């Protein structure tokens, strides 16, 4: 009987030990998979958009706090770089700001730029390549071509760039101030710090990037979607007449389709034309924009950087165009001046138009 009890005791402890080892191994694997080679444990927005994080973290209020609220304990401490902690400690010692307020500023800038950047809503993103990235190859391709079909596989013409250039990745930035008296008052009275200036700077860089994407920068030799040579140009009809907007978009999509582009198509218009689309279409009971959205399933957007009433229809896809991003927008500390503190919202990007024939402007 004693031997039976001993054997049962051994079996129980063997099973318990096995599961304990399995749990330790699993925890280490989870930690390494979540944070391996990542020095941005507390700054997930540097690489991911809100939509991406929402898809993984459903019904999780992570946005109101740092990411390590959920991904804490074993992994974060090992991967969160000492340099980053030391950098914040230096900033904190100079401006007397706590980490919660610093993260609040960073989150506000990220969410504001994500809300206001129109080009990034339909353009493929190439990157982020890193803060130090200063240039990127720019290949130009011809019209889409059919694949070959035969018995021996000898007649296929490979897709290749017609030419290659080097595109410079430019810094886009706007500075703002936080005043020493405001910071001290916020800390002493335990009131929220006013970050209106940071949000204003975020809106400013968003408009500048969209201006580069749509209008280009002629002084730097950067074409925009509305100015690229080789694009398709069609006449814009009077959209104040109900139905004309829809018909124009149909003709633009027809034009791109006839040249071999299958979509998805996206439409960007000026605010005035966007407002015209929000009227009930004749005897249908539907808004005109509803029919447009069924036609251009890549999205319908308005942009405030359009210099005139114009409509832009493009065939999206990285083969046709993309946005090369060096670094996403974030806040950097400039330094003290006159006892106040200067910050900079900064990022870097450049538009790469690889096939201008995939663009159709109605003007």
Swiss-Prot record:
Heme 1 binds at residues 44, 47-48. One of its GO terms (cellular component) is encapsulin nanocompartment. Residues 37-74 are annotated as: Diheme c-type cytochrome. Binds 2 heme groups per molecule. It is found in: Encapsulin nanocompartment. Residues 75-94 are annotated as: Linker. Its cofactor is heme. Residues 95-363 are annotated as: Encapsulin domain. GO terms for molecular function: heme binding; metal ion binding. Heme 2 binds at residues 67, 70-71. It comes from the Bacteria. Keywords: Encapsulin nanocompartment, Heme, Iron, Metal-binding, Signal. Residues 1-36 form the signal peptide. In the signal peptide was removed prior to generating the constructs for expression in E.coli. Fusion of the shell and cargo protein of a type 1 encapsulin nanocompartment. Protein missing its signal peptide makes 33 nm particles in E.coli (called cEnc), protein missing its signal peptide and diheme domain (residues 1-86, called Enc) makes 29 nm particles. The cEnc nancompartment encloses c-type heme. The cargo protein NIR-HAO (AC P0DV45) is probably targeted to the nanocompartment by its association with the diheme domain in cEnc; removal of the diheme domain in Enc halves the amount of cargo. The encapsulin nanocompartment is probably formed by 180 monomers, with the N-terminus (diheme domain) inside. There are 36 pores where the pentamers meet as well as 3-fold axis channels and dimer channels. PANTHER family: PEPTIDASE U56 FAMILY, TYPE 1 ENCAPSULIN SHELL PROTEIN. Belongs to the encapsulin family. Family 1 subfamily. This is Diheme-cytochrome-encapsulin shell fusion protein.
